[in-house]
A protein has these predicted regions:
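Alpha-helical transmembrane segments of integral membrane proteins
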Residues: 13, 17-21, 52, 79-83, ...
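Membrane-interfacial alpha-helical segments at the cytosolic side of multi-pass membrane proteins
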Residues: 55-71, 119-131
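Interfacial helix-loop-helix junctions of multi-pass membrane proteins
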Residues: 40-46, 92-116
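Membrane-interfacial, low-structure loops and terminal tails that flank and connect transmembrane helices
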Residues: 1-12, 134-150
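Membrane-interfacial segments
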Residues: 68-76, 98-102, 106, 129, ...
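"…centered on the first transmembrane helix and the immediately adjacent amphipathic helix/loop
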Residues: 2-67
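Small-polar-interrupted transmembrane alpha-helices in polytopic inner-membrane proteins
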Residues: 22-33, 81-100
Length: 150
C-alpha cells in the first residue's frame, strides 16, 4: 500500500505540534526533580507539596491528553483517556524512582498517588475544558493549519 509523502510530512508536523509540549513539560518535571533539596529551607513549601504534585501532573495530563486525542494513532485516539492515565502514572512512578537517587529527595507512594490523581483529573476534565476554551481551540487550529501549509 503506497503512502502519500505529503500526508506523512503533515502527520509528522502534527505529531511534533502536539507531542513536543508534553515531552518538554515532562523534561521540565525531570529537571526539577533532579535538584537536591534542603528540607529545612523548604518547610513552608512542604505544606503544599501534595497540591504541587497534583497541579504539576494535572498540567502534564492535559498535555498528554491533547497529544493522544489528536495523534492520529488509532490505538491512542481510540482511548486517549486510558492512554493518558497510564502514561502519566508510569511517568510519575519513574519520577519517584528517580528521586530516590537524588540527594535530599525521597521516593514517596503518597506523591505517586497525587501524581496519578493529577493526570486522571486532567484526563477526565479534558473534554469539558476544551469545550469551555473554544477560543484556545480555534487558535490551535489556526496554528496547526499554518504549520501544515509549510
Amino acid at each position: 500500500m503506497a503512502t502519500n509523502p505529503k500526508r506523512e510530512v503533515l502527520n509528522r508536523k502534527r505529531a511534533l505540534f502536539y507531542f513536543l509540549p508534553a515531552a518538554g513539560y515532562a523534561a521540565l518535571i525531570f529537571a526539577l526533580s533532579s535538584m537536591a533539596l534542603d528540607m529545612e529551607e523548604l518547610g513552608p513549601v512542604l505544606a503544599f507539596d501534595k497540591l504541587l504534585h497534583l497541579a504539576e501532573y494535572c498540567i502534564l495530563g492535559y498535555l498528554l491528553m491533547r497529544a493522544f486525542a489528536t495523534s492520529g494513532v488509532p490505538a491512542l485516539a481510540a482511548s486517549p483517556m486510558a492512554a493518558t492515565i497510564l502514561a502519566g502514572s508510569v511517568y510519575g512512578l519513574s519520577d519517584e524512582i528517580h528521586q530516590a537517587f537524588v540527594p535530599g529527595r525521597v521516593a514517596s507512594l503518597t506523591d505517586l498517588l497525587f501524581d496519578a490523581a493529577g493526570v486522571s483529573l486532567a484526563a477526565l476534565t479534558y473534554p469539558y475544558v476544551r469545550y469551555r476554551l473554544g477560543p484556545v481551540r480555534a487558535l490551535e487550529n489556526r496554528i496547526e493549519a499554518e504549520v501544515s501549509r509549510r
